[in-house]
Amino acid sequence: MNGAELPIFSGFYRVLSRYAPRSGVSAAVIFIASLMLLLFAGADRAVAQIEQEEPDVSPTLRTFDPVSQLVVAKTQLTRAKFPVIDVHNHFGFRFKGDREGLEQYVGIMNSNRIVVAVCLDAVLGSEEAHLKFIGDGNEKKLAAFVHIDFKGAGNREDPKTLACNQLGFVRQCVEQLRVAKTRGILGLKFFKSFGLTELNADGSLIKIDDPRFDPIWKTCGELGLPVIIHTSDPAAFFQPIDNKNERWEELSRHPDWSFHGDQFPAREELLAARNRVIKRHPETTFIGAHFASSSEDLATLSKWLDEYPNLVIEFASRINELGRQPYTARKFFIEHQDRILFGTDGPWPDLRLSYYWRFLETFDEYFPYSEDSPQPQGMWRIYGIGLPDEVLKKVYHENTLRIIPGIKDRFLQAADAEENNNK
């Protein structure tokens, strides 16, 4: 067989045969050249076929979910060591009126030794509807804070129509707070939208320390209603979503959680404005939600606690941050043991709650902080901080009984009921 007998190269062979003699190229050279082209073409077709039959199975960051090969102690905890008050829950937003779901979670509370849970979803001025939802037999176990509806019947496309920009809005809020307390409301909640997305009539962002809201802060102090305030968010949420961002995987799934860009205030600006409010109202107790949004920087948070005696903190959805710095976190919890409340951002399933107990009560190493896989708030594991019993009791309930006076009766009744059930 020669090159002329290979159909795919017959044309090429005829060209070479016609012009090769003029240049002194032999038939053997023509044959070898044809054969080499044939081999290359066959290799290309083979590679293409392999690629088609065996697609790339290399893991991506989205699918990377390694199983640890560490062989370390795993303490199995199914309930807290002491009775717990959880000050940060969202039964309204999560259950959306589903009584069955709420009742199921009350069962989870009982099995985990959460004797009282505070829901932050009641709307100021219409709190009775939410109180009815979480009540109906659960009055001893569930309590509520209210939050302010800045939008009302208005349209965000026309900020002048928003409730917060109507004449007498602050005065109305003050009056509603007084009524809410008589109905059993225990405090006021501010969401992170206050400072990040709530608008003035001219379309500019409302500043957290705007003096027009001073009567609200002042009234809470007069009524003994603590203010749980969520300002800003994790530091990574204010950074570009790029290969340097430690929460890239999370933000790539939820780009709307990012506050990077000129349209948002700087994180430091938001926290400074919040701190000015805390300083301006020393008679009002402020609960810094999510460790006052400084769980990545406990040294700075420690300075705030020293500077503002009316500030306490809770760590809902922040064991992911605290548990990756166990030495620093343990020292912080012990140093500020009178200023820390327990919160989860629940309702959560049993497994998520068990990670809270392991984090606080054990020295377990390198374990998940969430039942979700991959881990949802940073692709890492956490370590336990093994708090002493006297500190655990303060974090679990003693501090909250002091900070939220209206919760004491519920706690005592629920704790007594739990003790009787265990006899």
What residue spans do the PLM features occupy?
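N-terminal secretory signal peptides that target proteins for export/translocation
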Residues: 1-22
